[in-house]
């Protein structure tokens, strides 16, 4: 770990105020991007989609994220976070507006993927902001910022699903996209990059040869590569839970659509608390040992996934909700620890591109995971086979994380 070249905070601005704007932007980006999970049932009914096709919607979003992650990380290392907050809000909002007025499934997938480019730009943009503004309590700050992802997802389930039931999913999504664009303008107006993050010419001119050199360095960094592959499993498992918990509860456990939607809210709210709690735990109890914390998260998630397979039809809502709450706390709470681990494994000046690299690799988990889970359920006719598949993936994740920790310890 080499973070010796740290940026001194800009004394006249409160870093927590800047964190507030990053959090607001993150909430709204997730509010739109993660709306595919709660709206998936209604979109599927409207377009007559199979479960595997519904799973392709978040997969397309994260395909866009994987395409954007490294270029976004490279650009934010050069121009800072402020302008990108505006650009990504309009990119995501505009693409989802076009998606909302189409009835062609393949055009919908294309617009979701283009929106994913804006969605994927948010993580390197906000991660760089956290690294610039926080030298202490960075795990806590990152957890608070990452809480915006699950909070935005929970709000989309809590607000967009009832609105979509009343107005139709298209009108509800159009209104939400307009709100995202307005938030992007406000974030651009009030967020500040510290002076040390400002671009300096000619040092900050974008060089594609330097980009290729930087990407090559990321691929040669074995602990970062192993962490990123492990993140594929963690991210895929998280999106499987978010994408299918409503369908699972509605179709297999017999809950109403409203109560099934509430399970997604519970999962995401629990994940929001998890992101902050795991950040505090990693800063205090584990003294910054992020990889070990990720091992604990994966192990707990395996236990909960196996417990889900034992839930009988007709079980009470509150019994299901308690299981889903713990599941969400773990599998939706890992992201801040992942981002901290990735950026702290590399020199500070490479933090943006390291974020982009690990997101690019990790995004393939959510591109492959939900459609594969849906295919397993379509083939078997039983969600339990899907949950067994998720447990096996997380077991492999633990092996990768322990390997990455061993290599990182050797390097230090």
Where are these regions (language model features)?
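Helix-loop-helix hairpin linking two adjacent transmembrane segments in secondary transporters
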Residues: 145-195
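Cytoplasmic helix-loop-helix junction between adjacent transmembrane helices
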Residues: 111-151
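Conserved MFS/SLC helix-loop-helix module at the cytosolic interface between two early adjacent transmembrane helices
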Residues: 67-106
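Cytoplasmic membrane-interface "Motif A"-like loop-to-helix N-cap segments
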Residues: 78-89, 284-298
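C-terminal transmembrane helical hairpin of 12-TM major facilitator-type secondary transporters
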Residues: 288-341
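Residue-level signature of mid-helix packing/kink "hotspots" within the transmembrane helices
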Residues: 34, 62-70, 153-154, 268-272, ...
């Amino acid at each position: 770990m080499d973070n010796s070249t740290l940026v001194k905070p800009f004394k006249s601005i409160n870093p927590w105020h800047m964190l507030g704007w990053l959090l607001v932007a993150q909430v709204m980006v997730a509010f739109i991007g993660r709306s595919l999970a709660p709206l998936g049932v209604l979109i599927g009914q409207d377009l007559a989609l199979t479960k595997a096709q519904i799973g392709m919607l978040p997969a397309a979003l994260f395909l866009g994220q994987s395409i954007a992650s490294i270029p976004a990380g490279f650009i934010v290392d050069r121009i800072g976070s402020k302008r990108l907050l505006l650009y990504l809000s309009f990119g995501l909002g505009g693409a989802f507006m076009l998606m909302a007025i189409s009835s062609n499934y393949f055009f919908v997938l294309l617009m979701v993927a283009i929106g994913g480019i804006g969605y994927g730009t948010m993580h390197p943009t906000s991660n760089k902001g956290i690294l610039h503004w926080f030298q202490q309590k960075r795990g806590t700050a990152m957890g608070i910022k990452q809480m915006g992802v699950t909070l935005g997802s929970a709000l989309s389930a809590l607000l967009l699903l009832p609105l979509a039931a009343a107005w139709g999913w298209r009108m509800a999504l159009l209104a939400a996209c307009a709100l995202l664009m307005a938030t992007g303008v406000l974030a651009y107006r009030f967020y500040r990059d510290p002076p040390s993050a400002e671009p300096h010419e000619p040092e900050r001119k974008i060089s594609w040869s330097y980009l290729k050199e930087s990407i090559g360095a990321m691929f040669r960094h074995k602990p970062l590569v192993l962490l990123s592959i492990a993140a594929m499993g963690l991210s895929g498992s998280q999106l499987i839970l978010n994408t299918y918990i409503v369908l699972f509860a509605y179709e297999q456990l017999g809950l109403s659509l409203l109560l099934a939607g509430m399970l997604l809210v519970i999962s995401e709210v629990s994940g929001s608390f998890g992101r902050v709690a795991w950040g505090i735990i990693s800063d205090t109890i584990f003294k910054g040992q992020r990889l070990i914390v990720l091992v604990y998260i994966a192990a707990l998630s395996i236990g909960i996934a196996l417990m889900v397979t034992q839930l009988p039809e007709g079980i009470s809502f509150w019994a299901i909700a308690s299981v889903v709450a713990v599941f969400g706390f773990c599998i939706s709470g890992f992201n801040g620890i992942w981002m901290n681990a990735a950026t702290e494994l590399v020199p500070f000046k490479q933090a943006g591109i390291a974020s982009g690299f690990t997101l690019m690799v990790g995004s393939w988990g959510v591109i492959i995971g939900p459609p594969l889970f849906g295919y397993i359920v379509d083939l078997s006719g039983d969600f339990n086979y899907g949950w067994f598949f998720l447990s096996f993936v997380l077991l492999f994740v633990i092996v990768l994380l322990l390997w990455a920790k061993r290599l990182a310890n050797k390097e230090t």
